[in-house]
């Protein structure tokens, strides 16, 4: 199954696009944030495909974690209770130090960490594929421990 996320197309403006995705067996990933009201969350999740992306904090991607993992999990659990069958992945500001505390989530997005590793590898003339593989393995081990 292919997945698509369009960050500047919020609910309900994205309904037509989401329907077109569904017809083509493409998941359209809805964005949820800590400031999304409960009423709006219920409507978004009701209309959503099987997976949603929870923006853990109000910041820029790859920013330093400014919210405690406990607060992130509190918001995650509030969202998850609306429909436990929908997958909720957490992203924004995830670091290898915090993901262990968030391992109860359906998934954790670490895109900025991967981008930083690619840049670091290229700047030091190392193999980015190898180094990203090592990073992913390290993060996976943190979650498993």
Can you say where each PLM-predicted feature lies in the sequence?
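Non-cysteine beta-strand/loop elements that form the S-adenosyl-L-methionine
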Residues: 7, 50-57, 109-112
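Histidine/lysine/aspartate-rich catalytic loop segments that bind and position anionic ligands
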Residues: 25-63
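Short, small-residue-biased leader/transition segments that mark boundaries at the very start
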Residues: 1-2
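C-terminal helical cap(s) of enzyme catalytic domains, especially alpha/beta-barrels
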Residues: 114-145
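Catalytic cores of alpha/beta
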Residues: 36-47, 82-83, 90-108
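Active-site-adjacent beta->alpha loops and helix N-cap segments on the catalytic face
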Residues: 6-23, 37-42, 61-78, 96-100, ...
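Short beta-strand/loop segments at the ligand-binding rim of alpha/beta enzyme cores
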Residues: 21-31, 79-93, 145
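Active-site beta-loop-alpha junctions enriched in small/polar residues
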Residues: 9, 31-35, 57, 91-97, ...
């Amino acid at each position: 199954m292919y997945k698509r996320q369009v960050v500047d197309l919020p609910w309900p403006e994205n309904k037509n696009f989401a329907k077109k995705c569904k017809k083509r067996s493409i998941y359209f990933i809805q964005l949820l944030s800590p400031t999304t009201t409960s009423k709006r969350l219920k409507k978004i999740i009701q209309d959503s495909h099987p997976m949603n992306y929870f923006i853990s904090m109000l910041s820029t991607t790859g920013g330093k974690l400014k919210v405690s993992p406990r607060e992130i999990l509190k918001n995650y659990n509030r969202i998850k209770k609306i429909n436990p069958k929908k997958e909720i992945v957490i992203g924004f500001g995830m670091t290898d130090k915090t993901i262990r505390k968030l391992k109860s989530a359906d998934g954790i997005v670490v895109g900025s960490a991967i981008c930083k590793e690619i840049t670091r590898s290229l700047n030091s003339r190392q193999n980015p594929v190898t180094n990203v593989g090592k990073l992913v393995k390290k993060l996976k081990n943190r979650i498993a421990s």
